[in-house]
Amino acid sequence: MSSMEKHLFNLKFAAKELQRNSKKCDKEEKAEKVKVKKAIQKGNMEVARIHAENAIRQKNQSVNFLRMSARVDAVAARVQTAVTMNQVTKSMAGVVKGMDATLKSMNLEKISGLMEKFERQFETLDVQTAQMEDSMSSTTTLTTPQGQVDTLMMEMADEAGLDLNMELPQGQTGSVGTSVASAEQDELSQRLAKLRDQV
């Protein structure tokens, strides 16, 4: 295993560890919410407020861990592409030297700084790999198109039977959402017309 492959393994491991930390925070948030409810039932508002603050803090920490996990995972995917294409530059190799200790620390600020260095390296690597990625139809990018994210979130909300009131930027209306909405609107208009005819 080359040193770059070892670093790649450590990146993937760190992404999983960050995800685990996120789930741990989720559990702690739920436990704090239960404590809030119990404190309110006992009429102890001061204790309820403390547990509510803890719940919010755990929720925010969970989101931060999850966001960083996704970021590390995206960088790992880019390193994988670079390793596969044998395009690991000297400057990129320099960035990874202190990486292992940073990832093991689970310090979000340090990991964020490390990811920024990687992302800068990938900006230059992108120019070199664009042609190769096009031919491979690679979908590995550091950012995900927001329209696709919004559409997926709407689909998941529909499956769960929830109403997801999301403000989509103009010009990015999801075709799935609009066709369903217009069909529902047509049906509602027809029912309203029938009711008017009856009255």
Swiss-Prot record:
A motif (MIT-interacting motif) lies at residues 186-196. Probable peripherally associated component of the endosomal sorting required for transport complex III (ESCRT-III). Residues 10-30, 178-199 form a coiled coil. Keywords: Coiled coil, Cytoplasm, Endosome, Membrane, Protein transport, Transport. This is Charged multivesicular body protein 1b. Belongs to the SNF7 family. GO terms for cellular component: cytosol; ESCRT III complex; late endosome membrane; multivesicular body. It is found in: Cytoplasm, Cytosol; Endosome; Late endosome membrane. GO terms for biological process: endosome transport via multivesicular body sorting pathway; late endosome to vacuole transport; protein transport. It comes from the Eukaryota. Residues 167-199 are annotated as: Disordered. InterPro entries: Snf7_fam (IPR005024). Probable peripherally associated component of the endosomal sorting required for transport complex III (ESCRT-III) which is involved in multivesicular bodies (MVBs) formation and sorting of endosomal cargo proteins into MVBs. MVBs contain intraluminal vesicles (ILVs) that are generated by invagination and scission from the limiting membrane of the endosome and mostly are delivered to lysosomes enabling degradation of membrane proteins, such as stimulated growth factor receptors, lysosomal enzymes and lipids. Residues 170-182 have a biased composition (Polar residues). It is a peripheral membrane protein.
